[in-house]
Amino acid sequence: MKSDIQIAREAQKLPIAQIAGRLGLAEADFLPYGHDKAKIAHEAIAALAGRPQGRLILVTAINPTPAGEGKTTTTVGLGDALNRIGKRATVCIREASLGPNFGMKGGAAGGGHAQIVPMEDMNLHFTGDFHAVTSAHNLLAAMIDNHIHWGNALRIDPRRVTWRRVMDMNDRVLRQVVVALGGPANGVPRECGFDITVASEVMAILCLASDLADLQARLGRIVIGQTFDRRPVTAHDLGAEGAMTVLLRDALQPNLVQTLENNPALVHGGPFANIAHGCNSVMATRTALALSDYVVTEAGFGADLGAEKFLNIKCRLAGLQPAAAVLVATVRALKMNGGVARTDLGAENVAALRAGCANLGRHIQNLRRFGLPVVVAINHFSGDTEAEIAALADYCRERGVQAVLCRHWAEGGKGAEDLARAVVALAEGGADFTPLYPDEMPLAEKIETICHRIYGAGQVEFLPHIVERLEEWQAAGHGHLPVCMAKTQYSFSANPAALGAPEGFTIPVREVRLAAGAGFVVAICGDIMTMPGLPREPSALRIGVDADGHVQGLF
């Protein structure tokens, strides 16, 4: 079998103007970046207002395991399959971060014969959106220290500046640093640090903004720290939001590319799926809905994190109405949830699969809590046995959910046509989408609701200072905001080793953060790393350029 990058290089790509034409876009509606990438212009997006909307399909998954689930691959394969059965469908996914690409994750454009191209560009600099986010974020950081240096009229307390710097690379030594050493000319020394760009609130804002005006307003609401008398200081107080918006003006325009089967794909934005909402941009999703019958999108990690945030944060804030959910599962991952070691996953083990299906069952139940019809996509691996596939299908049938075997990795859209027909049937049957909690529910109660109803926790543990902080934000007018849970993606609990469907555990809320610009409150449960480090043998060791200038080892 050819590698992903070999398949991507052999793709018969169409000029991006033809892909835009399939969406009904004229030459003036997009800005080409070479022959195979483009940005859809602000003016073209504004002209789409009032158009009938297509149906929004969410692709999510069971809790991720090292065995792999193939969520992005399924998203792309489903988009191609919908087009094959006569529906105008567009795929919407996030952009890739350089850090994980050179660390240990690999690319983020699908796999096998269900990929988005140009794969190499997408996994490297693409159209420069992440550079723009990095620049806007660090401009604000520079303006904070510059303000303190030149007299500090706002009386910002250097000890309580919470705005860190960012870069799009994994570099553990930058997590905690001291800046402004070397004398008075270099500023006021203080502790600081770096996060990876996808952890920036600016990235979350870019992905939740509805237009340029909304982008600028959100940037102005960013809270960067406190004064000496504990009053919040915003980016607007520093006068930074205008210049930040200028840096992000082009980045706000969605990126148009294509699948291997020459169907349109909008790849835009990339917020962290733990301390942010982990979804592609509202601008891209709305644009696709106005230009397509069906829009297939995904949310980061498993349904307990990604789908919950997609539904409670993105859909709530953007007024989106999803029509159905596709829950991706693999025989291998379910056996792992049933207690099988990774090294033993190749052997048939129906009993372990049935035990691991408890994880799948809870995700099905949770998606139904939001009023969404669900179909399970069994992402096929060559080692899956007929008995294992039958047991998985039986489990789903007993719970009133259809399970569809998919072979899009090997066959492209053709291998997901049955899934596409099932999705169309579900979407045409209608959904009764409702967020899990109302806006007016107190912040602490929102956190408890997610922990009890989605995770299955028996208790939520708040440290005293966290309760005080939540009450303070509630009184300051932030109580209507949704909450963004930051915890391990590997388990329903805060313990990454607790696989399957644990119950009755305690979720410890260790820290809360106000993302006033993005428009949510982050609840951190356990240790969350916002600046990753490279592994002992990073992917970068295998990446290079051959004699013909072709990238080698990227994926």
From Swiss-Prot:
Catalysed transformations (reactions): (6S)-5,6,7,8-tetrahydrofolate + formate + ATP = (6R)-10-formyltetrahydrofolate + ADP + phosphate
Pathway: One-carbon metabolism; tetrahydrofolate interconversion
Record-level Gene Ontology MF annotations: ATP binding; formate-tetrahydrofolate ligase activity
Binding-site residues, ATP: T65, P66, A67, G68, E69, G70, K71, T72
Family: Belongs to the formate--tetrahydrofolate ligase family.
Gene name linked to the record: fhs1
NCBIfam families (alphabetical): PRK13505.1 (NF010030)
Entry EC no(s): 6.3.4.3
InterPro entries cross-referenced by the UniProt entry: Formate_THF_ligase, Formate_THF_ligase_CS, P-loop_NTPase
Stated name of the protein: Formate--tetrahydrofolate ligase
Keyword terms: ATP-binding, Ligase, Nucleotide-binding, One-carbon metabolism
Pfam families: FTHFS
GO biological process: tetrahydrofolate interconversion
Keyword Lipid metabolism: no
Enzyme class: ligase
